[in-house]
Amino acid sequence: MRHYEIIFLVHPDQSEQVGGMVERYTKLIEEDGGKIHRLEDWGRRQLAYAINNVHKAHYVMLNVECTGKALAELEDNFRYNDAVIRNLVIRREEAVTGQSEMLKAEENRSERRERRDRPEHEGADSADSDDSDNSDNADE
């Protein structure tokens, strides 16, 4: 069996069906003896260019190990499912199980947002507690 990285884009009006689609595709791979190494739902994102007058899509990435038969069936499912507006299958030399760069960047962004928002609230609290500590020391 070979390793593949699969990314497919779902029409934004069909975003609520993504869970069912992923379940169906993973079941197809696993029933044929394949294995899902990584599954990431990147959510709805802006497209670089419009596809069929659609400017956003729901992105899903899978790293799988499967047979050629299962891959062909999966590609047929993509082709005949109107909700899938684009797909990309890349053959990999080995299984990729780590977090993708896309998710790492998203986590970094959210961490920076948290840090940016946190000092305003914590800074005021720590300043108050420092003042009270200093006043206690002054009495001694």
UniProtKB/Swiss-Prot annotation:
<dbReference type="GO" id="GO:0022627">
    <property type="term" value="C:cytosolic small ribosomal subunit"/>
</dbReference>
<dbReference type="InterPro" id="IPR020815">
    <property type="entry name" value="Ribosomal_bS6_CS"/>
</dbReference>
<feature type="compositionally biased region" description="Basic and acidic residues">
    <location>
        <begin position="103"/>
        <end position="124"/>
    </location>
</feature>
<dbReference type="InterPro" id="IPR020814">
    <property type="entry name" value="Ribosomal_S6_plastid/chlpt"/>
</dbReference>
<protein>
    <recommendedName>
        <fullName>Small ribosomal subunit protein bS6</fullName>
    </recommendedName>
</protein>
<dbReference type="InterPro" id="IPR035980">
    <property type="entry name" value="Ribosomal_bS6_sf"/>
</dbReference>
<dbReference type="GO" id="GO:0003735">
    <property type="term" value="F:structural constituent of ribosome"/>
</dbReference>
<keyword id="KW-0687">Ribonucleoprotein</keyword>
<keyword id="KW-0699">rRNA-binding</keyword>
<dbReference type="InterPro" id="IPR000529">
    <property type="entry name" value="Ribosomal_bS6"/>
</dbReference>
<keyword id="KW-0689">Ribosomal protein</keyword>
<comment type="function">
    <text>Binds together with bS18 to 16S ribosomal RNA.</text>
</comment>
<feature type="compositionally biased region" description="Acidic residues">
    <location>
        <begin position="125"/>
        <end position="140"/>
    </location>
</feature>
<dbReference type="InterPro" id="IPR014717">
    <property type="entry name" value="Transl_elong_EF1B/ribsomal_bS6"/>
</dbReference>
<dbReference type="GO" id="GO:0070181">
    <property type="term" value="F:small ribosomal subunit rRNA binding"/>
</dbReference>
<dbReference type="Pfam" id="PF01250">
    <property type="entry name" value="Ribosomal_S6"/>
</dbReference>
<dbReference type="GO" id="GO:0006412">
    <property type="term" value="P:translation"/>
</dbReference>
<comment type="similarity">
    <text>Belongs to the bacterial ribosomal protein bS6 family.</text>
</comment>
<feature type="region of interest" description="Disordered">
    <location>
        <begin position="96"/>
        <end position="140"/>
    </location>
</feature>
<keyword id="KW-0694">RNA-binding</keyword>
